[in-house]
Amino acid sequence: MKSLWLDIGNTRLKYWITENQQIIEHAAELHLQSPADLLLGLIQHFKHQGLHRIGISSVLDTENNQRIQQILKWLEIPVVFAKVHAEYAGLQCGYEVPSQLGIDRWLQVLAVAEEKENYCIIGCGTALTIDLTKGKQHLGGYILPNLYLQRDALIQNTKGIKIPDSAFDNLNPGNNTVDAVHHGILLGLISTIESIMQQSPKKLLLTGGDAKLFAKFLQKYDPVVETDLLLKGLQQYIAHYPKD
């Protein structure tokens, strides 16, 4: 069976086409706040793939999701938008109001949560998200500005400091302003993760664009980097979705 999986974020649209659980095509593109228009440009390509179903993770509002739904109707196959539930597939949501939890975080937790295992799941994307699980119970988590948001905020709110692009590659004290900024921001986020990891034993799992960078500084916790974690969560969601 061929399936199309869509991850529609605030700035990017990612898609995977799988056949018998194997990824046969994957792409990610900036959608410039118009994901429906980007999807419209891909629809003919999708139409020739012999797809059987579509699973979607979307952070968009209802109006934009409805536009996405209308475009995908042209493929004439079942479409499922993943949602956050108080309980799903045995996983208990840790939020008081489940709908306030981001669907991307929910799917990442759904992908890995299992009985008798505790996880710390770090999403290294536009924001740094941290979710904790104890068995099949989601415990909630934390959201922090990522490396680049912190740097940009510092630039915008500090007169007289010009900070060019530079690698976040070191935790040592900076010997110049550029290094002091980059090393300080990275140290702050790494220290936050370490503080959480030291509270109780748990497996550390990293996903997102900067996952490998963070893993480099967290080696003592034996981090696992999962590049397609959201896809796995979306597949898990569809596997437990009620059949008509």
From Swiss-Prot:
A GO biological process of this protein is: coenzyme A biosynthetic process
Keyword field: ATP-binding, Coenzyme A biosynthesis, Cytoplasm, Kinase, Nucleotide-binding, Potassium, Transferase
Question: Which cofactor does the UniProt annotation name?
Answer: NH4(+); K(+)
Task: Give binding positions for ATP.
Answer: D7, I8, G9, N10, T11, R12, L13, K14, T126
For the keyword Oxidoreductase, the answer is no
Which residues participate in substrate binding?
Y95, G102, I103, D104, R105, T177
A GO MF label: ATP binding
- Give the InterPro entries listed for this entry: ATPase_NBD (IPR043129), Type_III_PanK (IPR004619)
Q: What is its EC number?
A: 2.7.1.33
User: Is Cell inner membrane a UniProt keyword of this protein?
Assistant: no
Quote the subcellular location field of this record.
Cytoplasm
Catalytic activity reads: (R)-pantothenate + ATP = (R)-4'-phosphopantothenate + ADP + H(+)
Q: How is the cofactor bound?
A: A monovalent cation. Ammonium or potassium.
Predominant location: cytoplasm
Enzyme class, first EC level, given as a word: transferase
GO cellular component, alphabetical, reads: cytoplasm
Pathway given in the UniProt record: Cofactor biosynthesis; coenzyme A biosynthesis; CoA from (R)-pantothenate: step 1/5
* Catalytic residues (UniProt): D104 (proton acceptor)
- Quote the Gene3D superfamilies the UniProt record gives: 3.30.420.40
Q: Out of the domains of life, which is the source?
A: Bacteria
Q: Which PANTHER family match?
A: TYPE III PANTOTHENATE KINASE (PTHR34265:SF1)
Question: How the protein assembles, per its UniProt entry?
Answer: Homodimer.
Its family remark reads:
Belongs to the type III pantothenate kinase family.
This molecule's function is given as: Catalyzes the phosphorylation of pantothenate (Pan), the first step in CoA biosynthesis.
Q: What is this protein called?
A: Type III pantothenate kinase
Protein's organism: Acinetobacter baumannii (strain ACICU)
